[in-house]
Structures are given as C-alpha cells and as structure tokens.
C-alpha cells in the first residue's frame, strides 16, 4: 500500500515537473531606444526638444557649432547667405551620442531658407542613419516642415522618415498641448488624442472668409497674398481653415514668386485668427 502511494506521488511530481518544464513565457517586446537630437539658435527648438524628451523619457543632446551664429537675426541671415555662395558649411562639435545605439531619433531644427538649418546639414553629412527611424520636428516663421522632410529623405535614404511636427515660433505657447497630441497620435505615448476630420473640397472664398485670411496674415512680411479658395473643419475649440492663396506682386521684393500657396488658419473661440503654417 505504501509502495502504491509512493508511486502515485512520484507520478504526480513527474507530471508537474514536465508541465512546468514545457511552459513557455512570452518574451516582452523591448521598447525602442529613443534619442532627441536638435540644433537651436534662439531656444525655440530647444523648448520643443525638451518637451518631447521629458514626455518620452528619451536621451537628449544638442548639436553645437564651433563658431556659433551671431544672436542678431539679420547677421545670421547674412552669414548663411555668404556661406551658401561659397559652398561652406559650419563646423560643429562632435556629438557624444552613438546613433547606432538608438532605434528612433527625433531630429529637431529651425527652418531657414525652406529647409533645416546648416548645422544640421553638417551633422547629416557625417552621420549614418541606415535602418533607423527619424522623426523630424521643427520651428519656423511661416512653414517648411514638408520641404525639410523631402530634403531629409534625400540626405538619409537608408532611414525611415516618420511623420513630423512643426510649430511657428510665434505660437510656441501652443506647443506643449500639440506635442502631446502628436506623440499619442503617432504611437509614442498612450492616451487619447484629437483626430480631426479631413478637409472637404475647397470652394471660392467668401468676403467673410477672405477677411479671416487677411486678419491672420496681417503684419507678417513674408506673406503678401490674396485668398482664392478655402475649406474648413471643426476643432475642439474653434475652426481650422485651409486657404489656397495667390501671391501678389511686391514692389519691394520683385523677385518674390507670384504662385499659389496654402495657408492654414485657426480661429479659436473668442480669439483672433492666426495662421499656423504655410506650404509653398
């Protein structure tokens, strides 16, 4: 009897051991390692970079010039133009972060002359982003995210360029909320985000809609245009308009193109119209 009980106990132990031995744990998928890398002259792009890094808990590093630009805006523009004419790029200090150790790189820059600032070009010329995911983000006076992304794709053909984020320097106060929405919408953060409807087909701009356009761009020297057609969609706290406008001739800048541009304008409740970006 004792032998029978012992044999039964051994059988149970053996079955349990086999059962435990055959059980497989599902390996946890490792979170992608992320780096926020940016160049900033005035601090605007730095503010966006820090907001992204803080939200994601990502590493962060600044691209720094050996001979920084003058804080004066016009002096910087003059130097950039001279460097462009001479085919010269600014020298930068070595970046400490090893790109090879990261899966996703958030690359930030101010937009100058329709693309990323020259120090970023210098960095891209020496960096290898093959097999990496790049998330561009930028600050600008009127626009340039779309054109910068095109240039980035040409400069780094081995990388996957993901959707980017851009904000006007004049609208930096809206950035924290927009960054949250951007990171959630693109799967970098968990949470709920506002998914906007597509714009409907544009129609000829009415007098009232043209007045909204004029009010939004009033005082901005780089936009001298007339609203042609428009579409609109609802925002949680107002309305967003997408205008197609025609650049008008300018006596002070006869070389300015007179082609069509797209201008995004938001009108929040009880606030004046503000343009958010221009696509040329």
Residue ranges: model-predicted function:
Residues 168-191:
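C-terminal helix of von Willebrand factor
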Residues 185-221:
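N-terminal trafficking/processing presequences and adjacent post-cleavage segments
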Residues 135-174:
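Short, glycine-/small-residue-rich phosphate/pyrophosphate-handling segment
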Residues 159, 199-207, 253-280:
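Compact beta-sheet-dominated globular domain cores
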Residues 1-7:
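Bacterial N-terminal signal peptides that target proteins for export
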Residues 16-19:
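C-terminal motif of bacterial Sec signal peptides marking the signal peptidase cleavage site
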Residues 24-107, 114-116, 121, 210, ...:
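N-terminal beta1-alpha1-beta2 submodule of the flavodoxin-like/Rossmannoid cofactor-binding fold
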Residues 54, 99, 125-131, 155-156:
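Short, conserved loop/helix-junction motifs that constitute active-site signature segments
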């Amino acid at each position: 009897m004792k032998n029978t009980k012992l044999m039964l106990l051994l059988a149970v132990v053996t079955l349990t051991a086999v059962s435990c031995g055959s059980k497989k744990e599902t390996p946890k998928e490792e979170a992608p390692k992320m780096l926020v890398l940016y160049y900033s002259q005035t601090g605007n792009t730095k503010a966006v970079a820090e907001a992204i890094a803080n939200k994601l808990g990502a590493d962060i590093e600044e691209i720094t010039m050996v001979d920084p630009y003058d804080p004066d805006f016009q002096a910087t523009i003059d130097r950039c133009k001279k460097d462009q004419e001479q085919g010269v790029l600014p020298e930068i200090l070595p970046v400490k972060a090893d790109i090879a150790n990261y899966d996703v790189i958030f690359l930030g820059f101010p937009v100058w002359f329709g693309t990323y600032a020259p120090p970023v070009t210098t960095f891209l010329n020496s960096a290898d982003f093959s097999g990496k995911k790049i998330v561009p983000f930028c600050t600008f006076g009127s626009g340039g995210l779309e054109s910068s992304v095109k240039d980035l794709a040409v400069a780094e053909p081995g990388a996957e360029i993901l959707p980017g984020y851009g904000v006007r320097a004049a609208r930096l106060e809206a950035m924290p909320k927009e960054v949250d929405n951007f990171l959630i919408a693109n799967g970098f953060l968990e949470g709920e985000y506002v998914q906007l409807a597509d714009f409907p087909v544009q129609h000829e701009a009415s007098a009232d809609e043209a007045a909204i356009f004029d009010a939004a761009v009033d005082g901005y020297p780089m936009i001298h245009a007339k609203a042609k057609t428009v579409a609109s969609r609802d925002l949680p706290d107002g309305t967003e308009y997408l205008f197609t406008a025609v650049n008008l001739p300018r006596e002070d800048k006869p070389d300015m193109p007179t082609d069509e541009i797209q201008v995004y304008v938001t009108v929040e409740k009880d606030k004046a119209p503000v343009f958010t970006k221009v696509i040329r």
